[in-house]
Structures are given as C-alpha cells and as structure tokens.
Amino acid sequence: MAMWLDSVPQLKSLGVSNAEIAELTKAHEAGMTDPSSVVLIQLARDHKTPFADGQSVADLLNAGSSEETVLELARLNQLGLWAGEARAMRLAGLSDKMILAVARRRSQGLPVLSGEKLGELKNTGVTDAMILQMIQKGDTDETATKLIAQLERAAGGHRFVYQAHAHR
C-alpha cells in the first residue's frame, strides 16, 4: 500500500485493490483528504464497482471544485465520463452549486442544459441565480440559445463576453 494509505485502517477493511490504490493516490495528490478517500471507496462499493475515478476527482479538485462537491458527484454516480464536462464547466466559471444542480438532474434522467450552453449563458452575462433557475426548471439548450440570441440583439447584435471586472 502507498505510505499514506497505511494510516487509514478503514481502507484496509474495505479490501482496496492495487488499481484502486493507484486511483486514490491521484485523488490524494490533488488534495482529497483521508476521510473522503474512505467515502469514495465506500461509494464505489455501494455502486458495486471498483473505484476507478481518481483522475476525475483530481481534475475536479484542480479546477476548483470543493471536496464536498466531488463526494456529492460520487454519491450521484456522476464522476466517470461526465466529470470532464463538469471540470470544463468549473473552469468556465460555473459554481459548484450549478454543477451539482446539473448532476442531480442528469442522475434522475431529467432534461438539463449542456455544459457548453451553460458556459455561453455565463459569458453572455446571465446571472448565476438565473442560470441556476434555468437548470432547476429543466430548460433545454434550445431555450438557452433563444435567450442568448435575445441578449445579443439587445446588445446591438454583437456577440460579447461578459467581464465581471472592468479593465482600464
């Protein structure tokens, strides 16, 4: 076992494989704490799969997502392939709250805006509160495209990028 894992007896009792240790090491090196590492393994056991999302966890943490957000994504079984989109959303300035709202809808099989459209909404100057409301209502990419077009027309027909801080 990796040296840091020797100090986490709960992991030994969960029968962690060498492959899972390698994945946990990636997450740990990105800042995942020991107690959360145990939770990740327990969640993988609950989903009856080996833990294989260490790189996804590391990428999300490195993009600025909180450990709590990563654990909630794991609870929702939304790490895996979707974690890349969640990471891109985070890097585009979307909050963990928005990412979790999208993940909850995805986990329930409900319609949800794509990460790309959410980023466009953010860049067009739509407030976080309005974006969150659109996610929770189940607005589609088509609805978002119409809103973006309206906002661009109102701005004189130009695509523009919202900047939170004026540069002089």
Predicted regions and their residues:
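General marker for long, soluble alpha-helical cores
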Residues: 1-168
